[in-house]
């Protein structure tokens, strides 16, 4: 099997009678997941003078999936000689549908508050939580979450560096009044995956050469005042 279509669960655990294409199965698993349904209760943007219905994370994710599909169709028409390098339509749609699953209510303010609350337990970051939901927390499989294909997980993985490597080196003091006044700036997390998903990340990038992995994971080192 194509190394990018492999799943983490042993082959014996997977349904042998399911004849759908691998990325079609990924798409179905995301759409039927609890995490995807929860997006309807999370506001994406409070649009002024746009009517009574605000854009939610769910409608935003559907729009992202549609735009991604349109981009691939456009590239297929313009560069037919590169079609073998382009993602399948189902795969790019799945990436769009799943990309915000880990983001909490109240946008980046909610993310910052959770990072503060979880400071002693590895912190919190919405994109990292997305990977955790997809690979562990969702209930499709006992140990692998939705057990999506490697390529789909790579597409969802936005920031290929763990939290600990990027977090600024000075820890905020929760009793510091200035830290409370500048809460968003003080506790905003780095863009990363969570340290707990290091093993999952290693599996995702395993097909890449050592050189490609080094280039893929390059980052600016953090300072006492700013994240990497």
Predicted regions and their residues:
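Sequence-structural signature of the catalytic-core scaffold of metal-dependent phosphohydrolases
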Residues: 1-19, 31-42, 62-94, 104-228
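A short small-residue
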Residues: 42-52
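Short, surface-exposed loop/turn segments at secondary-structure junctions
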Residues: 51-55, 80-83
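Aromatic-acidic/polar surface patches that form glycan- and anion
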Residues: 57, 61
């Amino acid at each position: 099997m194509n190394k990018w279509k492999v799943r983490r669960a042993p082959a014996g655990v997977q349904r042998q009678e399911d004849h759908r294409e691998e990325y079609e199965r990924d798409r179905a698993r995301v759409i039927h997941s609890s995490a995807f349904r929860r997006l309807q209760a999370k506001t994406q943007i409070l649009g002024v003078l746009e009517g009574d219905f605000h854009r939610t994370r769910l409608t935003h994710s559907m729009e992202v999936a549609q735009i991604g599909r349109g981009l691939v169709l456009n590239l297929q028409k313009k560069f037919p000689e590169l079609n073998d390098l382009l993602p399948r339509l189902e795969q790019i749609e799945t990436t769009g549908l799943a990309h915000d699953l880990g983001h909490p209510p109240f946008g980046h303010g909610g993310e910052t508050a959770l990072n503060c609350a979880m400071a002693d337990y590895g912190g919190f970051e919405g994109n990292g939580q997305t990977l955790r939901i997809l690979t562990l927390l969702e209930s499709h499989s006992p140990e692998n979450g939705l057990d999506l294909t490697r390529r789909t997980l790579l597409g969802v993985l936005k920031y290929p560096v763990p939290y600990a490597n990027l977090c600024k080196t000075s820890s905020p003091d929760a009793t510091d009044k200035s830290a409370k006044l500048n809460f968003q700036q003080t506790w905003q997390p780095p863009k990363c995956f969570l340290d707990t998903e290091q093993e999952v990340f290693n599996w995702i990038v395993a097909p890449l050469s050592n050189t490609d992995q080094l280039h893929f994971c390059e980052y600016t080192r953090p300072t006492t005042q700013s994240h990497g």
